[in-house]
Amino acid sequence: MQTPLQSPPEGRPRLLIVDDDALITDTLTFALGTEYEVLACESRSHAIELLRQLPEPPALALVDLGLPPTPHAPDQGFRLIADLLAHSPGMRIFVLSGQNDAAHARHARALGAAEFIAKPCDPAALKKILARALTVRDAEMRAERERARDAEELIGQSPALLKLKSQLAQFADS
């Protein structure tokens, strides 16, 4: 059996769920566990502790706004969004919360959340949202790798660099 401190198995991206309601985390783990390696936490502090132990961060996170010690206020959830992005800027964070007024949704997005999803939500719709986010993330990562490779080729083959390499080779021979 795999422990959360190991890398996720190939083909199953890691999903962090942070919600203080065990019924929610259990239901989401059951609904999403075939597509994702689900890691569930009940608080901001537990999520941060877990992140520090992982060899690589989760690709996705579902975050409730109302977390202990103030479950009826969004402060801990907002702080967690900032914490997650500071730890892993490429992580896609989705707020899944019953505290779904427009101001909270705007603030969560301003902090870097990809989307705000109101509770209760349809698990099938949530699966589609997460799958789409992974597709976009993977495309962005491929494009970034290609840009880096192209830049390396450009720099490595520029006329000035080729001339310098030639001069260094001549100098090394003397």
Regions inferred by a protein language model and the residue ranges of each:
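Two-component/phosphorelay signaling modules centered on CheY-like receiver
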Residues: A22-A40
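Short hydrophobic/Thr-rich beta-strand motif most characteristic of the beta2 strand and flanking loop
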Residues: E35-L50, H72-A73
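Short amphipathic alpha-helix used as the core "switch/output" element in two-component signaling
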Residues: E49, P71-G90
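Active-site beta3 strand of CheY-like receiver
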Residues: P55-L67
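C-terminal output helix
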Residues: A103, C121-L130
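AAA+ ATPase active-site-proximal loops
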Residues: R145-S174
